[in-house]
């Protein structure tokens, strides 16, 4: 049996109170949570505010447990606690796991095509294949963006570009927090299908959060289902994506949940999209 890519052992995590704001009190997200995440493509599913982003930050060694431990490919994430101030530690962390933040933005004067070549050249793949770079750009429909800079992109264009960077970087695990929320539905399908291909071909594992249950059902091999009480179930996508289980997690009728998703997509489709997705 394959070793898990991420393991939590009696993990507890709380966000600290903010002294300047009496309304922001200590918030416990996880309390004694233990689980393992298998290799492959894993979707994170659950209501807002149930810990999906917090889990990704913990697994990516961007934040650290209050107690218990998180291991990534057998390495305790506390080994990377100095990554923010020690470039060597940061390099070792990023070799194992990289992170796409929700609403991630950055600006640079360098053309996107040049940045992609640099990221691939300086990344962690042992073998460099120019055709792989060209394929990333083609499959993510980045060809017309290569001469532009990140500051000129629409939200959807930037999301596709950042996904491209993450795949070129060569980390063994890529964590993505809502990586395609700004894309049109057909683009989401193409991006997720491509992520499944890349994971199968390269052995890179991908964990992503998303709200569209239809997409997560088709484009993940495993699922993490987050509940409001702080518990999390991990299993094969087809086993967890069942009416009774989803209703238990979301605490709304299954049909109503899908209706809500449909209305949300209709609302997005009706909105103007400057620059496209």
Predicted segment positions?
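Q-loop/switch helix immediately C-terminal to the Walker
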Residues: 103, 109-122
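ABC ATPase nucleotide-binding domains
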Residues: 239, 243, 249-277
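H-loop/switch region of ABC-family ATPase nucleotide-binding domains
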Residues: 210-211
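Conserved ABC ATPase "signature" region
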Residues: 129-145
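Conserved ABC ATPase signature
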Residues: 149-153
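Helix-to-loop junction immediately C-terminal to a conserved catalytic motif
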Residues: 60
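Conserved ABC transporter NBD signature motif
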Residues: 68-81, 93
